[in-house]
């Protein structure tokens, strides 16, 4: 069982979408099932409507989930399991306030050492616990031994004892921390494999320790995806437009092309242009590079252009391109759905022609409107020349403006073959 577990706290990042796609592909390959879990326990950061936005984006990418969970619905179980660990002395109550903890963190930072909880409350007597009026967090007791797990991309990953302290499971307000909620939910939902970002590597041993303390014997495999870098070779920030899936879609990239690019990124693939469905035949998480991959929007644009060429008429119409034959034609100079739509809309809109060309444009317009519109462009051109006596730039510039609304563009001869049936409608505007 695979899962994708986003938080409704902002726009979906391309790194998150990449993880969703990989989990989904693997779930289809072994027919094990795919869970969508909305991790909404951080009330302060949750944004209304972002869960629906997640559903909408996944649907656009044709990613279908078998079961939907909201993490907040499991709060009762998180608290019950924390109580179980306390009862079994595998966890303890911590009364340290935030001010004290922050002061210790600053001291560690000043000393150039990583902060590690010092166990202040771990060995309090029952009387000390019962007599303490302050609110308490719940921390897991940690054995002083190394932790390791096998990562399908990185291989064996090991953490020394000093790298994992007695971390918090439940905060003083009785809400679960990310690691506790995630570990419990994966256990309860029968998750067997998790593909997620490299920033979660240090969370994995903690989640394994939680389930181990609860006596859970089910095995969960992991693969941590390397980070995606921007064109400067730095970690892609959420503040960068191209890191947002919503922004890429609105800009005019097809879901098919974005999925293609994210599967291709840092991967060994038998070909460059493919669909998510086609990748099921050969995708393997083990082929993903351990090294960070650089996001190249120019490459994405090239892939987008190829998917526009391959798309059916029906699909292009779904994307707002009412003239599919023209859409494919304009891939010779455009890569985005939005750019192509602008080009086509310009052809079928009223043209604003400058005074320099207006007189000649009117002569050409009259000639075309009175023509029988031959199949051959050269025949129409010669017909216009005979009627107007216009030649060279005096003919072609106003004619181009009448057809496209632009001084530059494709060969009129090529364009004519695609729009001749509508040419009187176009010219008359």
UniProtKB/Swiss-Prot annotation:
The keyword Protein biosynthesis applies. GO terms for biological process: glutamyl-tRNA aminoacylation. SUPFAM superfamilies: An anticodon-binding domain of class I aminoacyl-tRNA synthetases, Nucleotidylyl transferase. A motif ('HIGH' region) lies at residues 6-16. A motif ('KMSKS' region) lies at residues 235-239. Keywords: Aminoacyl-tRNA synthetase, ATP-binding, Cytoplasm, Ligase, Nucleotide-binding, Protein biosynthesis. It is found in: Cytoplasm. ATP binds at residue 238. Its EC number is 6.1.1.17. GO terms for cellular component: cytosol. The keyword Aminoacyl-tRNA synthetase applies. InterPro entries: aa-tRNA-synth_I_codon-bd_sub2, aa-tRNA-synth_I_CS, aa_tRNA-synth_I_cd-bd_sf, Glu-tRNA-ligase_bac/mito, Glu/Gln-tRNA-synth, Glu/Gln-tRNA-synth_Ib_cat-dom, GluQ/Sye, Rossmann-like_a/b/a_fold. Its main location: cytoplasm. GO terms for molecular function: ATP binding; glutamate-tRNA ligase activity; tRNA binding. It catalyses: tRNA(Glu) + L-glutamate + ATP = L-glutamyl-tRNA(Glu) + AMP + diphosphate. Belongs to the class-I aminoacyl-tRNA synthetase family. Glutamate--tRNA ligase type 1 subfamily. Catalyzes the attachment of glutamate to tRNA(Glu) in a two-step reaction: glutamate is first activated by ATP to form Glu-AMP and then transferred to the acceptor end of tRNA(Glu). Monomer. This is Glutamate--tRNA ligase 1. It comes from Campylobacter fetus subsp. fetus (strain 82-40). The gene is gltX1.
């Amino acid at each position: 069982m695979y899962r994708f577990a986003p938080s409704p706290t902002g726009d979906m990042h391309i790194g998150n979408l990449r993880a969703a796609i990989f989990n989904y592909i693997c779930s289809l390959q072994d027919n094990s099932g795919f869970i969508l879990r909305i991790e909404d326990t951080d009330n302060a950061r949750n944004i209304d409507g972002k869960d629906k936005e997640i559903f909408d984006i996944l649907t656009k990418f044709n990613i279908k989930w078998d079961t939907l969970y909201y993490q907040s619905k499991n709060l009762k179980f998180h608290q019950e399991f924390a109580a179980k660990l306390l009862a079994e002395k595998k966890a303890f109550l911590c009364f340290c306030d935030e001010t004290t903890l922050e002061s210790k963190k600053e001291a560690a930072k000043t000393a150039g050492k990583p902060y590690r909880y010092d166990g202040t409350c771990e060995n309090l007597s029952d009387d000390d616990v019962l007599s303490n009026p302050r609110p308490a967090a719940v921390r897991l007791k940690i054995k002083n031994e190394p932790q390791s797990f096998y990562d399908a991309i990185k291989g064996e990953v090991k953490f020394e004892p000093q790298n994992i302290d007695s971390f918090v499971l439940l905060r003083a307000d009785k809400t679960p921390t990310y690691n506790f909620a995630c570990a419990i939910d994966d256990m309860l939902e029968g998750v067997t494999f998790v593909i997620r970002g490299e920033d979660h590597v240090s969370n994995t041993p903690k989640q394994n320790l939680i389930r181990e303390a609860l006596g859970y014997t089910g095995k969960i495999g992991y693969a941590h995806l390397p980070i995606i870098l921007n064109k400067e070779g730095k970690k892609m920030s959420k503040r960068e437009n191209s890191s947002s899936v919503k922004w890429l879609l609105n800009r005019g990239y097809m879901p098919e092309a974005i999925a293609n690019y994210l599967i291709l990124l840092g991967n060994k693939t038998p070909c460059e242009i493919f669909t998510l469905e086609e990748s099921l035949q050969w995708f393997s998480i083990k082929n993903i590079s351990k090294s960070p991959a650089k996001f190249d929007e120019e490459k994405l644009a090239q892939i987008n252009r190829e998917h526009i060429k391959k798309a059916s008429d029906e699909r292009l119409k779904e994307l707002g391109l009412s003239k599919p034959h023209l859409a494919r034609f304009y891939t010779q100079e455009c890569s985005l759905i939005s750019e192509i739509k602008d080009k086509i809309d310009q052809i079928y809109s009223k043209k604003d022609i400058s005074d320099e060309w207006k007189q000649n444009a009117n002569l050409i317009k009259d000639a075309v409107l009175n023509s029988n519109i031959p199949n051959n462009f050269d025949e129409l051109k010669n017909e216009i020349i005979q009627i107007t006596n216009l030649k060279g730039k005096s003919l072609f510039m106003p004619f181009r403006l009448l057809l496209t609304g632009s001084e530059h563009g494709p060969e009129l001869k090529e364009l004519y073959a695609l729009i001749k049936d509508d040419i009187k409608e176009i010219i008359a505007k």
